[in-house]
Amino acid sequence: MEAENSEVAALVEKFTGFHAAISKLPSLSPSPQVDALFTELVAACVPSSPVDVTKLGPEAQEMRQDLIRLCSTAEGLLEAHYSDMLTALDSPLDHLGRLPYFDNYINLSKLENDLLAGHMAAPARVAFIGSGPLPFSSLFLATYHLPDTRFDNYDRCSVANGRAMKVGAADVRSRMPFHTAEVADLTSELGAYDVVFLAALVGMTSEEKANTIAHLGKHMADGAVLVARSAHGARAFLYPVVELDDIGRGGFQVLAVHHPAGDEVFNSFIVAQKVKI
């Protein structure tokens, strides 16, 4: 136990250092300095760790919450940068490999599709909430795994949607409309979907996550499936954690939980089904 506590303390100290360094950056837009620092930060999250961020003290919790905010801003700027770069090219899909962590998006979409396929037939309609300016998740699922499925993408930022709708082949874009909306404003629309994906950065705190899941549970159709991106171990310094208890309280039954292993960089995710009340 003492060794574990020492390891957690060392990890908190390391991420406190990252937080301090990132906070001093004049801009979070992609640059050699920003890219190098965030590459180092992500690498520090990959090894398995005994840390449970819910048990950290108030000072560490405050640092972690601000680090998540900074990472969210940087991720949005990174996606916007690469979205603009790709759509300036004649064939954007031929150049997707330029994006950092491209392989991780490929692997994540395959894992999520495989888990879904184990619990349901191919969905007719899917919603992706928090699609962002570079909607790789829905793009890869629509292109490589679910060629007959309609993907409705929701983001609260109209500028992000404007960028996103330019990415992808024309036949795929025809099945991927984009809507500008806050998740809290989606009600009757949610009942039309067989699957709803909830992006990792929709809801930046545990309370916001819980409220979002409760809202989805209230309006999704009985039997529909929720795929919620989460975080585990040291990755929880970069992304909010979805608590399984909140999934249950939201009216869902957990079907599967996947935590990345080895050198996988992507998020954890939870697959759950709306229970008829």
Which sequence ranges carry the predicted segments?
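S-adenosyl-L-methionine
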Residues: R163-A192
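A short SAM/SAH-binding and catalytic strip from SAM-dependent methyltransferases
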Residues: V183-A184, A192-K209
